[in-house]
């Protein structure tokens, strides 16, 4: 999607989508698919990691005027004893103010945070529009500052 190059992405969800698209195409339906962002989530014992899109090096190599934004994202209101921090890294295009990639590492909710990043990358939603997204908030289930809203606060001045 971001590089217009073929991408090796041996993931089950990508294979399932490719199968559905092929079936629709073979049945005569008009279908298209722009490709995958290479989104994945994994874990090593209690540590979880999820990544999508381009790394900073990849973005620069493909000609983007890219930079990195790092932040901490709590899994719930930080007043709760069992709230855990996740590290979030977002790669963005400084010229167009759109996200190009993201990585989330931590103990909980990394795939959920990353799915939101993948959506805004896929649809090229500009950072300035993040303030318009109505994120769910509950002190026991999420932080009041979603990572996309933190990106908005840091990048739109």
Protein language model regions, located:
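A conserved FAD-binding loop/helix module that cradles the flavin
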Residues: 1-55, 141-157
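Flexible, glycine-rich terminal cap/loop adjacent to redox cofactors
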Residues: 46-52, 61-157
């Amino acid at each position: 999607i971001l590089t217009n190059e073929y991408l090796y992405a041996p993931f089950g969800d990508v294979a399932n989508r490719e199968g559905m698209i092929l079936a629709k195409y073979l049945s005569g339906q008009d279908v298209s698919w722009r490709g995958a962002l290479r989104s994945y989530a994994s874990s090593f014992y209690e540590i979880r990691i999820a990544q999508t899109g381009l790394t900073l090096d990849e973005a620069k190599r493909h000609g983007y005027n890219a930079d990195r934004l790092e932040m901490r994202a709590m899994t719930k209101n930080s007043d709760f004893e069992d709230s855990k921090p996740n590290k979030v890294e977002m790669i963005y295009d400084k010229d167009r103010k759109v996200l190009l990639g993201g990585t989330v590492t931590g103990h909980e909710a990394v795939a959920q945070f990353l799915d939101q990043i993948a959506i805004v990358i896929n649809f090229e939603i500009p950072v300035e529009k993040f303030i318009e997204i109505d994120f769910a908030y509950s002190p026991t289930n999420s932080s009041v500052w979603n990572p996309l809203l933190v990106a908005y606060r840091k990048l739109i001045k």
